[in-house]
Amino acid sequence: MKSLLPLAILAALAVATLCYESHESMESYEISPFINRRNANTFMSPQQRWRAKAQKRVQERNKPAYEINREACDDYKLCERYAMVYGYNAAYNRYFRQRRGAKY
């Protein structure tokens, strides 16, 4: 009986400390966490946006041949189906490479 009382007090303290809710874990105190459309991209400077666009243009221009072939095949449904079975290289060769002696 003597050990039961301290054990109950210890359990109550453990529950109280574990269930304590600090103010740090509460949601933001801001009135509205969302911003309007005009201010949505103000965190990124115009120079950074320009640099990102330029980098994307360079990346689009310097694509490897296999990626260009794959994109061409993705736009044509029959080629895409053939590619699922035999691979994109075989599908591109079948549908887009000109055969010898063929007149187009």
Curated annotation (Swiss-Prot):
One of its GO terms (cellular component) is extracellular region. It comes from the Eukaryota. The modification 4-carboxyglutamate is found at E21, E60, E67, E71. It is found in: Secreted. Residues 51-97 form the Gla domain. Disulfide bonds join C73-C79. Associates with the organic matrix of bone and cartilage. Thought to act as an inhibitor of bone formation. Belongs to the osteocalcin/matrix Gla protein family. Keywords: Chondrogenesis, Developmental protein, Differentiation, Disulfide bond, Gamma-carboxyglutamic acid, Osteogenesis, Phosphoprotein, Secreted, Signal. InterPro entries: GLA-like_dom_SF, GLA_domain, MGP, Osteocalcin/MGP. This is Matrix Gla protein. GO terms for biological process: cartilage development; cell differentiation; ossification; regulation of bone mineralization. Residues 1-19 form the signal peptide. The gene is Mgp. The modification Phosphoserine is found at S22, S25, S28. Requires vitamin K-dependent gamma-carboxylation for its function. It comes from Mus musculus (Mouse). The lineage of its organism: Eukaryota, Metazoa, Chordata, Craniata, Vertebrata. The keyword Disulfide bond applies. One of its GO terms (molecular function) is calcium ion binding.
